[in-house]
Structure formats: structure tokens, C-alpha cells
Amino acid sequence: MKKNRIYFGLLILALVVTIVWTSAGMLGVNKEEKKYSVSVIVNDSNNDRWIAMREGLEQAAKDDDIQLNYVSTGVFASEDEEKALIEREVENGADGIIVQLVSSEDTYAVFEKIDSSVAVMLLETDAVSEGVYSVTAPDNLWIGEALAQTVLQDYGDSLSEKKIGILSGNQNQLSMQQRLGSVKKLLEDENIEPVWILSGQGENLSSELVTKQADEPVDILITLGNAETETAVDSISSFAI
């Protein structure tokens, strides 16, 4: 499969340099002069997808004299694992938490034990924050629509003859649900239905992709996020397309 046949949603973390500044601002306008501590917790923190964000945060933290703790994580097995990490960082003195939640469901439960004085910023989550938390995320409906439009424009009338597969990422996250919904809607409007849709992440998704492509090969692969794109690229050598 050629790289130009892999369509992906490139996550652009707009204004990443302002994130730490915003977190500090949420700690109070008339705050005392002190060095604030902000912890960053994201899924699979050493993944290359986070390099640009991490560099931006570190530079912003340096500029604003903030102690930044970029927490080393693997792929979270559950929400409880992530919740325990958040609570640990707060217990260790974090004044603010920047976090990418594993799931967008019941976000209140994740933070119910966190003191209200701790600033929380949800990253790439699109959870309903009810005015309590600051949310920074891309327009996921637009991303899904743009992906589908790109495929439609590239293939035109011949698209009806092509078989499409989708790597939909972590469908426990509202952001990925929205991207998938937009892609499916535009394809359905053209009477096109994907041959298969795979969800999940990491090694499990990679092995499932290789198996699925062997059993039900597709001509076009749409991936909804950076991690899914990397999985697809890493698996190209196994594809016969």
C-alpha cells in the first residue's frame, strides 16, 4: 500500500505554547509568586506522536518558570490506571494537570477526589466539562469530514469500485467517535460502506490489521489519528496492495 493511499487525521495541537500558561492562569489571578508545578499525563507518553507537543510544553514551561512533569506512561490498560496516576501527581504537589483521558465517559468520576484548587486541562478529549475544566482539542467533526472529502475528491466516480477500511482508534474517546461518525456519514451519503472498521490501539491493532487485510483486503485505508497512521505505515510491508 503506497503512503498516498493512507489518509490520516493529523492532530494539530494549536497554540500548544499557551497550554502551560493557561494552566497557570487557572490557578488564580492574584496568586503568590511561586514556581507552579504542572503534570502532563497522556496515553503512551513516549510515542512519537507526542514529540511536538512535549517540546512546545517544555519551552512554554521554561518561558513561564513552571516546573513541568511529563509523566512516563505506557498504553493504559484501564481508566482506573490513569486515575491512579492523576491522583498520585496531585498528592506529589501538582498545581495543575494536563491530561488526555482514556475514555470520555463519566469524566467527573476521574476527578472527584481531586481538590478544586488543582487546575485541570483536558487534552484531545472532547469530554463535556460542564464549565469545570478547560478543554483543548481539534474540531473532530471537521477532521472526519475533511478525511472523507479528500478520499472522495481523489477517487471521484471510481471510488465505488474501491474497498475501504478504517482504523478508528480508541472508540471510548468522544473525539475519535466524532471523527468516525463524520467519515461514515459522508461515505454513506455517497452510498459507500467500509468493508471493515477496526478500533483499538497498539500491538493488538497492528496484528488485527495484518490479519484483516489478509482476509478481507482493502484498496484504501483511512486512519483517524496519528497513532493509527503509524500502525498502518508500520504494517505496509505485510500488505499486498
Predicted regions mapped to residue ranges:
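Structural motif
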Residues: 69-91, 195-215
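Short, solvent-exposed amphipathic alpha-helices that sit
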Residues: 49-66, 143-150, 174-192, 231, ...
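Structured, soluble extracytoplasmic/luminal domains of envelope-associated proteins
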Residues: 77-120
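Hydrophobic membrane-insertion alpha-helices, especially the h-region
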Residues: 8-23
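Short beta-strand segments enriched in small/hydrophobic residues
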Residues: 26-53, 70, 133-134, 162-172
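Hydrophobic alpha-helical segments within soluble ligand-binding/sensing domains
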Residues: 136-161
